[in-house]
Amino acid sequence: HPAQSSSQLKVHSHSLGSSDIGWYGSPHWWEVAHAGFPASLQHVPLLLPTTHSVVRSQLDRWLAHKGLRPQLVAEIEDSALLETFGSTDLGVFPAALVAEKELLKRSQVRLIGACEGVQEHYYAISTERKVMHPLVQRILKQT
């Protein structure tokens, strides 16, 4: 979600875009889960973002819609930590497909399958409606 202004601080959200989410796992969990995806997620340990996350509520709805009751082994707030635990055989985890190339380069994980309909949204947050910083202006123009 975009940032919310408060009475003490006025902030503005500038959309940078969004990305579909995929399920990733170590080579071991890829072997177990790839062929029968998404039903196979019920038979592997899952690492999920905490319930504070917008993506988590989307993931919960997606899993319920698929009729899956997976084994949740950890709820992790930080996406980098989620990736770290997922790359060490602790379980399967969700991550943005837009970052797949970098994720595969950094970690020994594989894409198990896409989580259709679940998206991560990205925003630049500023204290002014008009962004003044030249680099941020360039990023916003490219979106």
Question: Where do the protein language model's features map onto the residues?
Answer:
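Acidic, Gly/Pro-rich loop/turn segments at junctions of secondary structure
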Residues: H1-V44, V98-A99
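Short beta-strand->loop
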Residues: V11-G22, K105-Q119
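Secondary-structure junction motif
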Residues: W30-A33, V44-K66, M132-L140
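A late-sequence structural motif
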Residues: W30-V32, R110-T143
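Active-site-adjacent beta-strand anchor residues
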Residues: L48-P49, E75, F93, I125
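Hydrophobic hinge/microswitch elements
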Residues: V54-R110
